[in-house]
A protein has these predicted regions:
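Negatively charged
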Residues: 1-234
């Protein structure tokens, strides 16, 4: 890893034939600004962990990224603790199956627009937004979760979230919801009345430390497959 790298100019790079950019800047912990608007990502299949642990990265311009061939995106921004906002409006995620750790530990992220995200092929969303401590609202109304199997710790540690609408989530195939909303300390109410939990085996710590939650509708929860409820409302 190039942990001492503070600036880098890649404006002359021709990336038109590149198929993988996984871990490209992983551990570049001294980088503060990065402009990749000239990058051609039309053939790229993997962006996994691309900016992982770029802990001081405050400005990242990837607004021009077009990703029609993208298959792997897990952990792309994991550990980008200084990023405040991200523009992913041009991302094509229609072929991606694993969204795990995507924004994990993006502690300073205040704005995130994912309305254009296609998650129809997704099967995993483990730790997807874990420890996004500055996010206050998150619109996931466009998410297709019909194939998702694991949602464990998806919103774990999103301590500033005051509004979260996941009422449209299709959870019919989900088996693991452990820690899903753990430490969402600012949430006061949550509508999960449409959740299909018939296949869920693990709900441990699901609402653990949701200290502001005053209203929770779980009347339609099917707990017949559950084997672990430890710490569920702790």
């Amino acid at each position: 890893m190039s942990s001492g790298l503070k600036t880098i100019d890649l404006s002359n790079f021709d990336t038109s034939n590149v198929t993988t950019m996984g871990n490209m800047f992983d551990g570049c912990s001294s980088l503060t600004d990065l402009d990749l608007t000239n990058f051609d990502t039309s053939k790229v299949t993997s962006l996994s962990n691309m900016f992982q642990n770029c802990t001081n990265l405050k400005t990242l311009n990837i607004s021009s990224f077009k990703t029609p061939a993208l298959l792997y995106i897990a952990g792309m921004f994991n550990g980008c603790k200084s990023l405040i906002k991200l523009d992913l409006s041009n991302f094509d995620t229609s072929k991606v199956s694993n969204f795990s750790n995507l924004f994990q530990n993006c502690n300073s992220l205040e704005y995130l627009d994912l309305t254009s995200f296609n998650t129809s092929k997704g099967t995993q969303m483990v730790n997807m937004f874990r420890n996004c401590q500055k996010l206050k609202t998150l619109d996931l109304s466009s998410f297709n979760t019909s194939k998702i199997v694991i949602m464990s710790c998806m919103f774990y540690g999103c301590t500033s979230l005051v509004e979260l609408n996941i009422s449209s989530f299709d959870t019919s195939k989900v088996t693991d919801m452990s820690g899903m909303l753990c430490s969402c300390k600012a949430l006061t109410e949550l509508d999960l009345s449409n959740f299909n939990t018939s296949k869920v085996t693990n709900m441990s710590d699901m609402f653990n430390s949701c200290s502001s939650l005053t209203k929770l509708n779980l009347l339609k929860f099917d707990t017949s497959s559950l084997t672990d409820m430890s710490g569920m409302f702790y």
